[in-house]
Amino acid sequence: MIGRLRGIILEKQPPLVLLETGGVGYEVHMPMTCFYELPDAGKEAIIFTQFVVREDAQLLYGFNNKQERMLFRELIKTNGVGPKLALAILSGMSAHQFVNAVEREDPAALIKLPGIGKKTAERLIVEMKDRFKGLHGDLFTPAADLVLTSPNGPTSDDAEQEAVAALVALGYKPQEASRMVSKIAKPDANSETLIREALRAAL
């Protein structure tokens, strides 16, 4: 079981990061709320991981702290919620926001996320509410808004294409992802900024 990786970021392609440690490059799927906080390529990062085995693949999911990973583990225990949907949930809102939505019994907040219908939202609230008693604490307080800059980043067209691809990977349909990015596109914005703004506008 791979539970933690420390190494150098080789590539960042939302929602994937390639981390080199011990001469091995690990491809890690990360929620966008965690991806935003990663340092730039070429710098060191520590990622807490969850190893998931499927019939057709073995995947690593990564998080910035143990609490986020614990929430992911609880989510995939919920009936009808697999790793891909859990990743989409934690990309669309922070752990703190998700906990608050469940505790407020607010299915409307969850329905806005890709792949979440009314029944799934209600099931999440019922199944997750009791589990949160031992989960959330200081590390689930909202983080300060991050200012993302990329002075030497890709062109705006490249950034928009990367943002659309990331949203599709998170469960949005291609046409919907393209529309979401077009609505918030800015000439000098990098892909991470576009993804964050698109997800924020969808809530």
From Swiss-Prot:
Mind listing the UniProt keywords for this protein, alphabetically? Cytoplasm, DNA damage, DNA recombination, DNA repair, DNA-binding
Give the UniProt record's GO annotations in the biological process aspect: DNA recombination; DNA repair
Name its cellular compartments: Cytoplasm
Segments of this protein annotated with the region Domain II: 65-142
**Pfam families reported in the protein's UniProt record:** HHH_5, RuvA_C, RuvA_N
- Give this protein's Gene Ontology molecular function annotations: ATP binding; four-way junction DNA binding; four-way junction helicase activity
Q: Does the keyword DNA repair apply?
A: yes
Region Domain I: which residues?
Answer: 1-64
The organism's place on the tree of life at top rank = Bacteria
Where does the record place the region Flexible linker?
A: 143-154
Q: Which GO terms describe its cellular component?
A: cytoplasm; Holliday junction helicase complex; Holliday junction resolvase complex
Q: Is-annotated flag, keyword Heme?
A: no
Region (Domain III) residue ranges read 155-203
Q: What does this protein do?
A: The RuvA-RuvB-RuvC complex processes Holliday junction (HJ) DNA during genetic recombination and DNA repair, while the RuvA-RuvB complex plays an important role in the rescue of blocked DNA replication forks via replication fork reversal (RFR). RuvA specifically binds to HJ cruciform DNA, conferring on it an open structure. The RuvB hexamer acts as an ATP-dependent pump, pulling dsDNA into and through the RuvAB complex. HJ branch migration allows RuvC to scan DNA until it finds its consensus sequence, where it cleaves and resolves the cruciform DNA.
Q: Any domain commentary?
A: Has three domains with a flexible linker between the domains II and III and assumes an 'L' shape. Domain III is highly mobile and contacts RuvB.
Quaternary data: Homotetramer. Forms an RuvA(8)-RuvB(12)-Holliday junction (HJ) complex. HJ DNA is sandwiched between 2 RuvA tetramers; dsDNA enters through RuvA and exits via RuvB. An RuvB hexamer assembles on each DNA strand where it exits the tetramer. Each RuvB hexamer is contacted by two RuvA subunits (via domain III) on 2 adjacent RuvB subunits; this complex drives branch migration. In the full resolvosome a probable DNA-RuvA(4)-RuvB(12)-RuvC(2) complex forms which resolves the HJ.
Which family would the database say this protein is a member of?
Answer: Belongs to the RuvA family.
The protein in question is named Holliday junction branch migration complex subunit RuvA
Organism, as annotated: Enterobacter sp. (strain 638)
